[in-house]
Amino acid sequence: MTKIITHLLNPLAVIIPILLAVAFLTLIERKVLGYMQLRKGPNIVGPYGLLQPLADGLKLFIKEPVRPSTSSPLLFITTPMLALTMALTLWLPLPLPHPMTNLNLGMLFILAISSLTVYSILGSGWASNLKYALIGALRAVAQTISYEVSLGLILLAMIIFAGGFTLTTFNTSQETIWLLTPGWPLAAMWYISTLAETNRAPFDLTEGESELVSGFNVEYAGGPFALFFLAEYANILLMNTLSTILFMGAMHNPITPELTSINLMIKASALSMLFLWVRASYPRFRYDQLMHLVWKNFLPITLAMILWHTSLPIFTGSLPPQT
């Protein structure tokens, strides 16, 4: 009985804070964009608009989930659930400061599951049976698959630095120096690729309002739309937490080791705020520019960096112990 309770409570203890963080990330986004455009943002519901996410969530979940008569019913309903399930599953191997499941190949697991999220987007666009939704879904799939190539190669270079696929290994390897310092070109490309991977501005071509109405989720309303929304923002938080663990020495703080989780949260929040800053500052890329960036610029540079980061430690005999 105790085991059952533990297996129920442990995932809940991770899922509920993630969903709460997602809710308030939407509020921060609206506030930040508001102040950057010289306006207030939401400030009616609750003090300083703090209850706005709760009001939004309540409104979305009590709305009738309208389904177009031409859509494929089963696929149309299952894809939003699949999207959120995948987004929450990705948090399992992250050390926050202790992972839910300490996988030997944590990085590989994250890459595999993040590749599967493509199916939820493709399924939703396909099931809607609408040209705008399908074009948005195809754009999203092409974009996600393209940028996953550069993400995977950057990860490979960082694994050579750290000496293992386990995320806790990254914390140990950054006790003396952040990997951001020796690998700053990789870190810059990683951050831009995470923007593209999560379909955020300036790479939000999947939901280009001017040409695609709203992209792959154009036919979704109420609860299913809210699930897509939660999945998108959970992925943003996940990517920034992962960036923190990989490049910014997430845990190590020799003076106050008990503040490791707060340390991680502050860094991940700062990176998330940078996402919002980028959204407020840059216009949308053209589709050919988006593809040119990853295949003609990022891919050759990343391959060159992998060769450099592999050959130099072998030449100088300074490869880290492989775990």
Swiss-Prot record:
Main function: Core subunit of the mitochondrial membrane respiratory chain NADH dehydrogenase (Complex I) that is believed to belong to the minimal assembly required for catalysis. Complex I functions in the transfer of electrons from NADH to the respiratory chain. The immediate electron acceptor for the enzyme is believed to be ubiquinone.
UniProt entry keywords in alphabetical sequence: Electron transport, Membrane, Mitochondrion, Mitochondrion inner membrane, NAD, Respiratory chain, Translocase, Transmembrane, Transmembrane helix, Transport, Ubiquinone
Listed EC numbers: 7.1.1.2
Protein name, per record: NADH-ubiquinone oxidoreductase chain 1
Topology relative to the membrane: Multi-pass membrane protein
Compartments (UniProt record): Mitochondrion inner membrane
GO cellular component: mitochondrial inner membrane
Family: Belongs to the complex I subunit 1 family.
Catalyzed reactions: a ubiquinone + NADH + 5 H(+)(in) = a ubiquinol + NAD(+) + 4 H(+)(out)
Group of enzyme by EC: translocase
Molecular function as annotated in GO: NADH dehydrogenase (ubiquinone) activity
GO BP annotation list: aerobic respiration
Listed transmembrane segments: 8-28, 74-94, 105-125, 150-170, 176-196, 227-247, 258-278, 298-318
Pfam families: NADHdh
Keyword Ubl conjugation among record annotations: no
